[in-house]
Amino acid sequence: EHAPLVLAQRCSGVPAQTPLFTSLLNYRYSKPKVAAAHIADGIELLDGHERTSYPLSVTVDDHERDFTIVAKVCERIGPQRVCELMELALEQLTRALSANPGGELAELDVLPAAERAQVLHGWNETGRAYARDACLHQLFEAQVSRTPEAAAVICGDETLSYTDLDARANRLAHYLRGQGVGPDTRVGLALGRGVEMMTGLLAILKAGGAYVPLDPGYASERLRAILDDSRPAIVLADAAGRTALDALAGAPPIADLHADASRWSALPSTPPRVEGLTPRHLAYVIYTSGSTGQPKGVMVEHASVVNLWRALDEAIYRTHPSARRVSLNASIAFDSLVKQWVQLLSGRTLVVVPEPVRFDGRRLLDAIGRDRIDVFDCTPSQLALIEGARGPEDEAYPQVTLVGGEAIGEGMWSELASVSSRTYYNVYGPTECTVDATLARITAEHAPHIGGPLANVRAYVLNERLSPAPVGVRGELYIGGAGVARGYLNRPELTRERFIDDPFVAGGRLYRTGDLARWRTDGSLEYLGRNDFQVKIRGFRIELGEIEAQ
């Protein structure tokens, strides 16, 4: 019994304008032709072609002694390219049948040499010089000497100059050194956004340690899990942080940056000396959601953050030299905060966004305008609140908006692309690759995409065998280069699973993102979702396994 596909589609409920499927392979046995078909006197059928309404269809006719292959490809897919790929695949197949008839089809390399070179090397020619031998706090100290009286941090009515911030951080760093903090020593940071947070963060780096963000608003179970895994030598806290940690039995020693300030207020205001500290030591350990129910700590080194700073400077800030005021908007536990505070290394001013207004579009816009914030960094969810509240009087600020942490839908992309008075960038990157790995300016010429790799970053779209996927073909996105983290703290097996040797660069490492993507013909990447059950909420990665384990 046979039924036409039109009937099948009608019964399926799929709208008539939507293809029932987008590609069709039809293999059929056809008896060898013995004579031209006779239709009527004086008419002879020489040849014929079937037509389908599907974007891609391939018909294989088996004539016993030979085959006929006919491909029909709609124009927007690229008929010439599809036929070239088919020709190469058939060529490789015939060679394999002769040389290795027992081999697997998946081992065939169907990528043309020129295209292979493009996706592996051409679109990854991102090498740039940067300060490979400097630690973050050293670059900050160099900036202090250049702009000592410039505003470093503004928080409400309080403004702290570069000199004052440096002196405060140095005194606290001397105290931390006295508590045994040195290279790769982990120090908790349980503070809200503000002057104290930046003082504590810089002090930890100056003492040689790595900061471990602890959001005071986290559930006690999550705080306990992070503390048990990271085992910080000491925790720097404000009142809210201390309250959250005091509720936990067996918490590490706590230094309250308000109540305990007398312990270090008389210590030297010059940087402490830390022997053996290099850019390959840890700058921070940030915890992300874990599929087993336990959060996992991502270890990031100074050198990776220094490269992020330089890459963003090249990709964004040099294009907008007047953008001097940068929002300090993210939670301390969100790695997006890193690309915000590193702007201190360039002499910019960090403006703290008050917590009560962060998710009130109208009040947030008022704060951005009042504080003259030039660069705002947020998730699409937060941006939707801002744009929904924006009126004609709100056109000036911010000049530049960095949007990341979640995928941008087509509607928002089109809306942002239509704005001429402000510039929007879509940034993409997992915590394991130091915040941002790719970047795209949002313009009307393109549909939503995540752009290409930043300076000293490599991006590959690979199949299950770690072979590069052709342009336009979906695969898993792998990230290599200067941003790849050291690995997961206390998780050697997971580190080996997710951080692998780079098969294309000797001595390199790749991070398996779990994100699905494909290359576009212009060298940009299109994000296609996940290959697992991870989701993002307001920019935070959530493993459903962690929720199930509660």
Label for each model-derived stretch:
Residues D47-T68, E84, L88-E91, A99-I286, ...:
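AMP-binding/adenylate-forming domain of the ANL superfamily
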